[in-house]
UniProtKB/Swiss-Prot annotation:
Entries under InterPro entries matching the protein: Chalcone/stilbene_synt_C, Chalcone/stilbene_synt_N, Polyketide_synthase_type-III, Thiolase-like
Gene source species: Cannabis sativa (Hemp)
Name of the protein in question: Chalcone synthase-like protein 1
Active site: C166
Function: Chalcone synthase that may use malonyl-CoA and hexanoyl-CoA as substrates but without producing olivetol or olivetolic acid.
Localization per Swiss-Prot or TrEMBL: Cytoplasm
GO molecular function (one): acyltransferase activity, transferring groups other than amino-acyl groups
PANTHER family assigned to the protein according to its UniProt record, in alphabetical order: CHALCONE SYNTHASE, HYDROXYMETHYLGLUTARYL-COA SYNTHASE
Enzyme class: transferase
Enzyme nomenclature, EC number: 2.3.1.-
GO biological process per UniProt: polyketide biosynthetic process
């Protein structure tokens, strides 16, 4: 007869404390574009300068985004080398894939190296890898390629998330939380890498959503180290604790945000009702997440919100009567980098913790103890994570 029960084995396998974010790293392609200059570049490089009315409309779209600058992998030279990317809806999936399967892991590696350096521990301690990207589906995936680029153990346990979209930063943290809390001693490297080659399309009057995307999206990568029971004796310093994580889709929101992989790349649609759908349903998510803690004052929280666009942020702010400063870090990231899909929330988290330290705030969360992180994406899907800040 066995001397130990399954229950005892399971208890020994689990961590004692909550999952924590131990380090954050970010990266962008070196080429950046000022938003004010992008309409001229976009219509010139696609040889559509004759479409003056459409260009004027695109300029107005760019102005409404509140974006000042974005980083993009696609340069004029790269576009000219691949003329099928410049022709509206021309077959070009292979061209896009050839670039994406190489560049997505490379950009992810840049962010990962920064997170690992901040963490300060040997790469051999990384037990799990979660890699997420909207584009570049391949087998083996970007998780495998990046593990090799980083020199991770061949036995690292990998999870690959493709084509999740803008909510997937929250998805990655939710999965990392479960892995950290159910595997004692686990250290999870999360990587999100987004490059917009997959959704680049020439301007056309029949594809307004595509023009919105050309004005809104940017390229970037992020990485975190997640683990429970941080070992402060060896220098692990947690930034945030993850208290709860939930995912739901908004009822009756089919088709609000969707994307379809075609011969011409990823074609997506963003319904004009998205800001209203999110703002009408966000309080329900807040109540469900924060009732157990006894919090009902939304201004007593620090906020990390996916910057889907200014209309979404304005609608959420108005619905919840949030003070302007609550979205300041989110708006800063939108302004300086654009919407980087699943990557954006990590740039905001990084900005929040660094600003809190620079301004002498008592906690990593702008001096507040509790906070929320929201991801919004296709579905409409909402990811809600409750965070607990730590002393600076």
């Amino acid at each position: 007869m066995a001397s130990i029960s399954v229950d005892q084995i399971r208890k020994a396998q689990r961590a004692n404390g909550p999952a924590t974010v131990l380090a954050i790293g970010t990266a962008n392609p070196p080429t950046s574009f000022y938003q004010a200059d992008y309409p001229d570049f976009y219509f010139r490089v696609t040889k559509n300068q004759h479409m003056t009315e459409l260009k004027d409309k695109f300029k107005r779209i760019c102005e409404k985004t509140t974006i000042k600058k974005r980083h993009l992998y696609l340069t004029e030279d790269r576009l000219n080398q691949h003329p099928n990317l410049l022709e509206y809806m021309a077959p070009s999936l292979n061209t896009r894939q050839d670039m994406l399967v190489v560049e997505i892991p490379k950009l992810g590696k840049e962010a990962a190296m920064k997170a690992i350096k901040e963490w300060g521990q040997p790469k051999s301690r990384i037990t799990h890898l979660i890699f997420c990207s909207t584009n570049g589906v391949d087998m083996p995936g970007a998780d495998y390629e990046c593990a090799k680029l980083l020199g991770l153990s061949s036995s690292v346990k990998r999870v690959m998330l493709y084509q999740q979209g803008c909510h997937a930063g929250g998805s990655v943290l939710r999965i990392a939380k479960d892995l950290a809390e159910n595997n004692k001693g686990a250290r999870i490297l999360t990587i999100n890498s987004e490059i917009t080659i997959g959704i680049f399309h020439s301007p056309d009057e029949t594809y307004f959503d595509g023009m919105v995307g050309q004005a809104l999206f940017g390229d970037g990568a992020s990485a975190t180290i997640v683990g429970a029971d941080p070992d402060k004796e060896i220098g692990e310093r947690p930034v945030f604790e993850m208290v709860s994580a939930a995912q739901e889709f908004i009822p009756n929101s089919d088709g609000a945000v969707d994307g379809h992989l075609t011969e011409a790349g990823l074609v997506y649609h963003i319904h004009k009702d998205v800001p209203g759908l999110i703002s009408k349903n966000i309080e329900k998510s807040l109540v469900e997440a924060l009732n157990p803690i006894g919090i009902s004052d939304w201004n007593s929280l620090f906020w990390i919100v996916h910057p889907g666009g200014p209309a979404i942020l304005n609608a959420v702010e108005a619905k919840l009567h949030l003070k302007k400063e609550k979205m300041a870090d989110t708006r800063h990231v939108l302004s300086e980098y654009g919407n980087m899909s699943s990557v954006s929330i990590f740039f905001i988290m990084d900005k929040l913790r660094k600003r809190s330290l620079e301004e002498g705030k008592s906690t990593t969360g702008d001096g507040f103890e509790w906070g929320v992180l929201f991801g919004f994406g296709p579905g409409l899907t909402v990811e809600t994570i409750v965070l607990h800040s730590l002393a600076n």
